[in-house]
Amino acid sequence: VFTFHHLKVDYKNGEKWSKEPFDFMKLKHLFTEWQEKMDQGGGWNALFWNNHDQPWALNRFGDTGKYREKSSEMLATAIHCMRGTPYIYMGEEIGMMDPHYSSIHDYVDVEAKNAFAALKQKGISDDEAFAIVKTKARDNSRVPMHWDDSKFAGFSESKPWLLPTDQDRINVEKELHEGEIFAYYQKLIKLRKHEQLISDGHIRMFLKDDPQIFAYERFLKDEAKKILVFTNFYG
């Protein structure tokens, strides 16, 4: 089952084109409800943060500055250890984030351009309208994969439809030699494959009212072995 409600927890009053911090408790409630009911009813969920129609999860739910790597690993842990099938969108395994565009003309997606025009018609200034569009534009995650630190990030020798902006410090080549995010994803995948209680087990949610911790445990029916997962979204 693919559900997208968790990617709307930063919509102000349900409005996509708004600039609003994400609602952690709402996100937590959604994950808790899906996990518990899927487990009880024998359902199976798709686990993901990113896709081609969303801005990068790291910008929405994590930290893109000092703690970019740890934040990327935290977000990965939160979903890869849950019950369901985890999906990795190209670039999240190296910590890619929204490009640093400075103009609506940097985007090509008609939805973003139309939203910018609609916001201006409401009397919102150009700068504020762009700031809003920048946080939700689909093109954010459609920038070519950062393979290396070359002008077009190793994607091509000619100018791509969207220009990369962080390839000098975030790229596959550098990540494989100096980074820690890709290696962490490998460890998560290996753990999931080797531990049946993660791939096939049940789930029990903890600290449901905690304002910054998302926690749960995984276990098999006999509960002879358990794995506790704690992820801190704010510290």
Write out the residue ranges for each language-model feature.
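Loop/helix patches that line or flank the sugar-binding groove of alpha-linked glycan CAZymes
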Residues: V1-W17, P21-M25, H29-T32, K66-G235
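Alpha-helix C-cap/termination motif
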Residues: K37-G41, C81-M82
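Active-site clefts of carbohydrate-active enzymes
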Residues: G41-K66
